[in-house]
Amino acid sequence: MTESEFLKQAEATLDQIEASLEDLADTSDLDVECTRSGNVLEIEFIDNGSKIIVNSQAPMQELWVAAKSGGFHFKATGTQWINTRDGAELFAALSEMVSKQGGIPVVLQDAN
């Protein structure tokens, strides 16, 4: 994948994560605030002040996630982002992380 293809896919994925979280905040008891700065998406949980950070790493062609449960690297395989350690899909993994840190079960939707 070229760098421009990676950046386009990473940008679309960050946009989708943010949109999915905003939809959940509007339709559930999930109280989060998303802040975007370039290739970094910061998800802040208002109730407890914890955060999840998702950012793209162009040199590695990966999305990195930092959460209470640890740090994770996801590599694009077709239209999905797969954890380089355990093979988990990004949106499924983020759903679990957001559920744990937010205190309510949520499912983030991937538009693909």
From Swiss-Prot:
GO MF assignments: ferric iron binding
InterPro entries named among the record's database cross-references: CyaY (IPR047584), Frataxin/CyaY (IPR002908), Frataxin/CyaY_sf (IPR036524), Frataxin_CS (IPR020895)
GO cellular component: cytoplasm
Protein family per UniProt: Belongs to the frataxin family.
Function of the molecule: Involved in iron-sulfur (Fe-S) cluster assembly. May act as a regulator of Fe-S biogenesis.
HAMAP family for this protein: CyaY
The name this protein goes by in its record: Iron-sulfur cluster assembly protein CyaY
Phylogenetic classification of the source organism: Bacteria, Pseudomonadati, Pseudomonadota, Betaproteobacteria, Burkholderiales
